[in-house]
């Protein structure tokens, strides 16, 4: 099942993505995130990847957003240091 979900993403990475300029606002890129999420969480990881793609637009800051170890559709936010 995982291979079936990952194959179209690999196709996109190899043949479609190089045609366009880089535009993903996150690290890892949305396609790399989706592959890692599928490998960790299966079908739920696919949903996590779709949610990530929907978050990737010009009005978001972006930045580091690694795949969490637990299923969530929200961004994996880091704790910000408190200002003293």
UniProtKB/Swiss-Prot annotation:
Superkingdom is Bacteria
Q: Does the keyword Hydrolase apply?
A: no
Sorted alphabetically, the Gene Ontology cellular component annotations on this record are:
plasma membrane
Span-the-membrane segments of this chain are none
Q: Please list where the region (Disordered) is annotated.
A: 63-84
Q: What is its main location?
A: membrane
The record ties this protein, via InterPro entries, to: Membr_insert_effic_factor_YidD
Keywords of the record:
Cell membrane, Membrane
Where it sits in the cell: the answer is: Cell membrane
Q: How does it sit in the membrane?
A: Peripheral membrane protein
Recorded family membership: Belongs to the UPF0161 family.
Described purpose of this protein according to its UniProt entry:
Could be involved in insertion of integral membrane proteins into the membrane.
The record, for HAMAP family, names: UPF0161_YidD
UniProt-recorded name of the protein: Putative membrane protein insertion efficiency factor
What organism is recorded for this protein?
Answer: Streptococcus mutans serotype c (strain ATCC 700610 / UA159)
């Amino acid at each position: 099942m995982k291979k079936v979900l990952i194959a179209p993403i690999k196709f996109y990475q190899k043949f479609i993505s190089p045609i366009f300029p880089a535009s993903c606002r996150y690290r890892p890129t949305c396609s790399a995130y989706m592959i890692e999420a599928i490998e960790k969480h299966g079908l739920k990881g696919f949903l996590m990847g779709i949610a990530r793609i929907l978050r990737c637009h010009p009005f978001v800051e972006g930045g580091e957003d690694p795949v969490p170890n637990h299923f969530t559709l929200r961004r994996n936010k880091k704790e910000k240091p408190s200002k003293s």
